[in-house]
């Protein structure tokens, strides 16, 4: 989501927040496709696909989608962080907007508490989200911030990040020992960004939050988004059958691109 109109393509309006939407059924899936398509529309796209809240409201049709917000990189935490004096009023307005767009039974608030040791703000944020939920009578769910499947995959994730930012794990560790800031520091300091077991989730979240999370599963129907391939009719030249013609094209391509270039 962009904070201002997504038509405004300026550095000041380039900051985006995460926004999660699930399709409850096949109609919701088609609606989700419309949202993704519109976010990639050149009129809205700026550095990344995005929509403003007003544009989102224009695109969403019916009550076939589920949405939740509360991840550290999402809209509500951003409002809380940037507006310490009047965040509650802004958050209340946002929750009302989301319930109007998706339906009050289809919008949830989200808590994440899997990495309180290295991310102490998680607990403070979750308490504010729970308070907001009580005021707005909104159900609260719980999720892990899973970037890899198993806890032992943390090292592989760190190596992948090092590859992306063109550095080495040795260099990252040295900088952290020297007290320097490093990109994606939470992933290098913690191994908690995996899919927690039900028992692990129960240790850090309330029973009600876990039940509400399971409720989302029961709200979603099973549906198939895969269609059979739709191939256009194609006539092969010289009355060849498709297998013969494909074989001929492969041989011609091999002769033109490979055979003549072999030392």
What would you call each of these model-derived segments?
Residues 1-263:
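Phosphodiester-processing cores and adjacent nucleic acid-binding clamps
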């Amino acid at each position: 989501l962009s904070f201002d109109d997504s038509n405004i393509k300026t550095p000041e309006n380039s900051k985006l927040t995460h926004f999660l939407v699930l399709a409850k059924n096949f109609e919701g899936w088609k609606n989700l496709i419309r949202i993704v398509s519109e976010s990639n529309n050149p009129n809205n796209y700026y550095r990344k696909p995005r929509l403003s809240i007003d544009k989102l409201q224009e695109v969403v049709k019916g009550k076939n989608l589920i949405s939740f917000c509360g991840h550290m990189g999402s809209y509500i935490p951003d409002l809380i962080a940037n507006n310490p004096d009047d965040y509650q009023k802004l958050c209340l307005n946002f929750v009302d907007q989301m319930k109007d767009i998706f339906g009050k039974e289809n919008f949830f608030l989200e808590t994440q508490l899997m990495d309180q040791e290295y991310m102490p703000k998680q607990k403070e944020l979750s308490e504010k989200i729970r308070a907001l939920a009580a005021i707005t009578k909104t159900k609260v769910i719980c999720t892990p911030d899973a970037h890899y499947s198993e806890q032992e995959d943390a090292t592989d994730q760190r190596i992948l990040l090092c590859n992306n930012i063109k550095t080495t794990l040795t260099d990252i560790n040295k900088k952290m020992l020297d007290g320097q800031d490093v990109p994606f520091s939470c992933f290098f300091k913690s191994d908690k960004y995996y899919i927690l077991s039900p028992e692990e989730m129960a240790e850090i979240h309330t029973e009600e939050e876990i039940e509400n999370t399971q409720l989302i599963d029961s709200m979603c129907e099973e549906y198939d988004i895969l269609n059979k391939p739709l191939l256009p009719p194609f006539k092969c030249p010289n009355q060849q059958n498709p297998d013969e013609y494909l074989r001929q094209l492969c041989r011609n391509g091999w002769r033109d691109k490979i055979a003549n270039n072999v030392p």
